[in-house]
Amino acid sequence: ADLKGLDLSGLNLDKANLISAILTGANLKGISLVGANLFSVKAMRADFSGANLSGANLLKANLTRTKLQESNFNDADMTGINLSDADMRKTDLTRAKLVEANLPGVDLTGADLSEAKLTGRYQREGYFSRGANLKKGVLVGAKMQGADASGTDMVETDCTDVDFTNANLSEANFKHARLKSTCFVNTKLGDADFRGANVIDCDFSGAELIEAKFQGVDLSSVKNISAEELQSSQIDSETKIPDYIEVNWTSEDTYE
């Protein structure tokens, strides 16, 4: 169906079949699409502000540069979706499936991604693909408690005030990310890469840091990082350690 540029605001299209529909530039403000099938839909630059898409199927949909503020994607399947440069401020993505999602430049300020899944997946060829791409995104104040975001790409992403409590971020890439007052309480961060990241006032209480890469990172202001976990991570003589942990360097890359 070609619905390009149409005004569909406020309509109830629950459980509608819109497979491969063209919604480019359409006005879908406040629309209800609960449980709808939007597989492979093209909705670039459309306005979904305040829309309800809970439980919808958005596999491989293209929502580049869409407006999605305060919309509801509870339990939606968004595997392989393209949300590049989308405005998703205050969006509810609780338990949403964002496997292999492409979200570079997305604005998720104040969004709720509790228990969302942002991982890669096993391909037929037998290899595991990378997690969601959130490169250069804005996640200020987002809730990501219990989210599975292993392997997620957060290079240069702004994660100020994000709550990652109990999340799985193993192998996540935080290179050059902004991590100010970010909460990593009980977070799995094994093999995560923090090199070049701006890490200020973050809480690492109970975080798992095996092989996490902190070479050259300033950790002087972080809270509750345990000496034991830090020892299991990768640091070097350029890493700035908090005052409450004592490290004696015996050579450039060994310490006691």
PLM feature spans:
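Tandem repeat scaffolds
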Residues: A1-E256
